[in-house]
């Protein structure tokens, strides 16, 4: 009888231990071209990175494990929930040449991130490159016209993320070489919503996009900020 009890206790302990080992923090990404890769983003999204010849642009990132988000997840025992990154997408609905793009703007993709423990927002670069209007700081009652502007759209984005994923940690990852008004906008808006910023620095690029070295630097800098909040498959 004691032998059976011991075996049963050992089996239960093993199951619990394996369950704990398998538990991983789930990470979702809401991004632009910097976070795309062929076969790893939401179907239908535009890409910039990939392994097939048509994505050979002269950038040395040609394998998914070279991307910043794959390095971040693989190196730190995390799990990818959803990567909803779209090349060329803006946070607001005003895109290149003044085109109205409510279909691929960050604020249009908020509900597609699954059930993340951590949400990583990587945007603003195309808003600057496209010359999207900044607009005013606005924290409620957004109209379609308001969301054509970067500041109201970023406010709306964080508001929706916090309501849609109330238990998820949210990080705003900011590219290098943005105009000062974009950094200032992120600072003010992130402070209002309690969003942690990751302000990137010294990122090597090829054709305006992170190279392998740049991707590794992004992964390292993001983990330096968020790593202290993650322990043994849980966020704190």
Question: What residues fall within each predicted segment?
Answer:
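Generic structural signal for helix capping and beta-alpha/helix-loop junctions
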Residues: 37, 90-93, 180, 207
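Conserved SGNH/GDSL esterase-like catalytic core that processes O-acyl groups on lipids
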Residues: 26-28, 40-135
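Alpha-helical cap/lid subdomain in secreted, periplasmic
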Residues: 100-236
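N-terminal secretory targeting modules
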Residues: 1-64, 74-75, 112-114, 166, ...
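A mature extracytoplasmic/lumenal domain signature
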Residues: 31-33, 85, 176
């Amino acid at each position: 009888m004691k032998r059976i009890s011991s075996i049963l206790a050992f089996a239960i302990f093993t199951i619990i231990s394996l369950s704990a080992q398998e538990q991983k923090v789930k990470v979702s990404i809401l991004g632009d071209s910097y976070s795309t890769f062929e076969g790893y983003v939401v179907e239908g999204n535009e890409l910039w990175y990939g392994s097939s010849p048509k994505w050979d642009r002269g950038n040395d990132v040609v394998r998914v494990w070279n991307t910043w988000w794959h390095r971040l997840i693989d190196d730190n025992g995390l799990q990818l929930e959803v990567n909803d990154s779209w090349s060329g997408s803006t946070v607001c609905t005003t895109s290149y040449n003044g085109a109205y793009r409510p279909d691929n703007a960050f604020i249009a993709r908020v509900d597609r991130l699954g059930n993340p423990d951590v949400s990583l927002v990587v945007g603003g670069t195309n808003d600057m490159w496209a010359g999207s209007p900044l607009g005013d700081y606005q924290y409620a009652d957004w109209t379609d016209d308001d969301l054509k502007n970067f500041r109201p759209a970023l406010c709306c984005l964080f508001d929706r993320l916090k309501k849609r994923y109330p238990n998820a940690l949210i990080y705003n990852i900011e590219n290098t070489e943005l105009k000062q008004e974009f950094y200032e906008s992120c600072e003010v808006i992130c402070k209002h919503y309690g969003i942690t910023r990751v302000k990137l620095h010294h990122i090597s690029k090829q054709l305006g996009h992170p190279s392998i070295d740049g991707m590794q630097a992004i992964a390292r800098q993001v983990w330096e900020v968020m790593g202290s909040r993650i322990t043994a498959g849980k966020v704190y």
